[in-house]
A protein has these predicted regions:
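NAD-dependent ADP-ribosyltransferases
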Residues: 1-208
């Protein structure tokens, strides 16, 4: 296969609606306000702390930051589906449309890698223990208890992820929180955040 430079690598994403040159970290929260506050804290610290085994389904002893390798349309569809589950089946709140996006090659340089979807015990047999943070359980053997997160196309960064504002884009769910985010930056004299970030994506504009 012919070597591919970055220009041609990016061209592939341009012509494929199912691919993205960016990966997205969605902030969690039981409410929209909590998820928004978590996003603000990440921006103020310029750091995403890794989830641990006790708090975020991470295998092994190494914390990891979780991101999704999916285009915005797919992320928007996943968010809509999760909202439907919460309303119809009283599922636990996972994500509410707040997040932060990075160029994939930036994450790669931070030692971010795609996760490995497999049965946990099987994956532990062929991965060294210091790579167990990459394991995400996949089990389709029981029709009554399917475990499948492959739709998230997850990447993980071991430890924590530090960044500069110029390396990220912000995601908010709607115009209300777009205005609230801008107001926060102005009220707190953090215009530098607004001026340096690569952009702000309003998920509601992706839906319709």
């Amino acid at each position: 296969m012919k070597n591919m430079d970055e220009k041609n690598w990016r061209k592939r994403f341009k012509y494929r609606v199912d691919l993205s040159s960016r990966v997205t970290h969605l902030t969690k929260g039981e409410t929209a306000e909590e998820a928004f506050r978590n996003l603000i804290n990440i921006l103020e610290e310029r750091r995403i702390r890794g989830s641990k085994t006790s708090s975020g389904f991470i295998c092994g002893k190494t914390p990891a930051v979780c991101l999704q390798d999916a285009p915005l349309t797919a992320i928007a569809e996943n968010l809509q589906y999760e909202e439907k589950l919460r309303k119809e089946e009283n599922h636990k709140v996972r994500y509410l449309g707040f997040g932060i996006r990075f160029q994939k090659n930036f994450i790669y340089k931070k030692n971010g890698r795609p996760v490995i979807y497999d049965e946990t015990n099987r994956a532990k047999e062929y991965l060294p223990e210091n790579e167990w943070w990459r394991i995400v359980k996949l089990d389709l053997s029981n029709k009554e208890h399917i475990i499948d997160w492959t739709h998230e196309r997850e990447w993980r960064v071991p430890g924590e992820l530090c960044f500069e504002y110029s390396q990220c884009e912000i995601i908010v769910p709607n115009s209300k929180y777009y205005k609230k985010f801008v107001k926060y930056c102005l009220d707190k004299n953090r215009e530098d955040i607004l001026l340096k970030i690569r952009g702000i994506v309003v998920i509601a504009s992706v839906y319709f």
